[in-house]
């Protein structure tokens, strides 16, 4: 039988079996020799904090941000609709913490932008809203369908 040994001065805070060292940022791009890099640019993110990044309205209250996978925040938005709409556009480029629930096309698509902005303002404080928009190619109309279970 094995003898039990007590070590009162030894503290195991992170055993190697469960401790995983934090990795630095992954390499961005590794090209084989037969490829030629045509552009390699690093640019800081937008620093505008007084306008919504989606609808460009003035932010008169505390803005909402997109939460990233690593716990950071990106962007400044006036509503969850604006936040989720932009998040659905950038989710293939930005690692998001959660899947966006709303997806609208950029305002440049709409002839009557004020109608879209009025919808955003009307539903700004509503919880549980989800949905999307649908482009009807034959009639060149965009149907916005937002719903709630609450």
Curated annotation (Swiss-Prot):
* Pfam families assigned: Pox_TAA1, zf-FCS
**MF annotations from Gene Ontology:** identical protein binding; zinc ion binding
Superkingdom field:
Viruses
Q: Does the keyword Transcription regulation apply?
A: yes
Q: Which UniProt keywords apply?
A: Activator, Late protein, Transcription, Transcription regulation
What GO biological process term is on the record, naming one? DNA-templated viral transcription
UniProt keyword Metal-binding, yes or no: no
On subunit structure and binding partners, the annotation says: Interacts with itself. Interacts with the late transcription factors VLTF-1/OPG093.
Q: Which family does it belong to?
A: Belongs to the orthopoxvirus VLTF-2/OPG126 family.
Its annotated function is as follows: Acts with RNA polymerase to initiate transcription from late gene promoters.
What's this protein's name? Viral late gene transcription factor 2
Question: What organism is recorded for this protein?
Answer: Vaccinia virus (strain Western Reserve) (VACV)
Q: What is the lineage of its organism?
A: Viruses, Varidnaviria, Bamfordvirae, Nucleocytoviricota, Pokkesviricetes
What is this protein's gene name? OPG126
